[in-house]
């Protein structure tokens, strides 16, 4: 019992010390269960790729981690520092030029940078922010954006690039939802290099397998409401996933066999029912409940 208590205490302490963690999180959207008592721990330095079939809840999980959504139950522990976030949907309320919107994430410094870009450069000279100005402009240019373009006039794909630029400038800790969408190969290569050099902690969703293979140091799969961790790169993930599913199928087969045996036993004649073991009956009820709660595998990732 003492050993179990120490193990549970260590698990709680580990989550508290993690950069970002979830404990027992449940999320239902429109009556659809996406997460069921899910746990996750993200350490500083992780580059974590979230995978799962369409509709499994990957974008919702990113929104939970970033604070845009709240769970139905459970706890999410976030860092006190800023996290640069690229959501799936660009906010409709953004207004201004591309440069001003990207620099905006830097707070007062960003306002000074935007003023400098507009020609009132005295604030930046006072704060010594020309190097930061160059960083903002470089990201904007590498993403193929016009810094002086009005945001409301841009296409949907170009607006997503603005959202990506904001995230990259905001923080070295990043949550990115499909960051390579609407990017050409050269820009994707630049983004990969930038993230490898600049990102401290990265959580991302991407259907670009080459991008995931180059960046991911961990893979977490969203599958039937649970989160499955694979401590490997994306290249080894398919093999590890097949191993997990095979083990799961074996466990389910044993459970189904046991359930069938117990159902046959409970249906025996009147004499057997009179002498049946009540503990065995309770175990059968529990088996039925476990089988009813099981969410069968649906499609491929």
Task: Mark where each language-model region is.
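Intracellular alpha-helical coupling/juxtamembrane segments of multi-pass membrane proteins
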Residues: 240-273, 277-283, 287-294
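Flexible loop/N-cap segments at domain edges
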Residues: 297-301
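ABC ATP-binding cassette signature C-motif
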Residues: 3-252
């Amino acid at each position: 019992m003492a050993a179990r208590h120490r193990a549970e205490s260590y698990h709680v302490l580990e989550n508290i010390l993690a950069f970002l963690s979830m404990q027992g999180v449940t999320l239902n959207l429109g009556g659809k269960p996406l997460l069921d008592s899910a746990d996750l721990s993200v350490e500083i330095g992780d580059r974590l790729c979230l995978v799962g079939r369409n509709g499994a809840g990957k974008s919702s999980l990113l929104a939970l981690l970033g604070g845009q959504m709240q769970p139905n139950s459970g706890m999410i522990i976030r860092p006190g520092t800023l996290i640069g976030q690229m959501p799936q949907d660009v906010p409709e309320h953004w207004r201004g030029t591309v440069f001003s919107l990207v620099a905006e994430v830097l707070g007062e410094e960003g306002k000074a940078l935007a003023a400098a870009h507009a020609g009132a450069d005295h604030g930046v000279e006072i704060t010594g922010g020309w190097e930061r100005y160059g960083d903002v402009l470089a990201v904007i240019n590498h993403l193929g954006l016009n810094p002086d373009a009005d945001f409301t006039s841009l296409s949907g794909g170009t607006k997503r690039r603005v959202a990506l630029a904001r995230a990259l400038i905001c923080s070295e800790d990043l949550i990115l939802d499909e960051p390579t969408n609407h990017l050409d190969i050269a820009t994707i290569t630049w983004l990969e290099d930038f993230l490898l050099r600049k990102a401290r902690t990265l959580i991302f969703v991407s259907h670009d397998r080459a991008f995931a293979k180059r960046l991911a140091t961990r893979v977490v799969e969203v599958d039937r409401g649970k989160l499955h961790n694979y401590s490997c790169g994306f290249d080894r993930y398919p093999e590890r996933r097949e191993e997990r599913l095979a083990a799961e199928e074996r466990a389910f087969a044993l459970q189904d066999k046991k359930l069938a045996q117990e159902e046959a036993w409970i249906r025996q004649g009147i004499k057997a029912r009179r002498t049946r073991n009540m503990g065995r009956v309770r175990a059968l009820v529990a088996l039925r409940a476990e089988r009813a709660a099981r969410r069968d595998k649906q499609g491929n990732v």
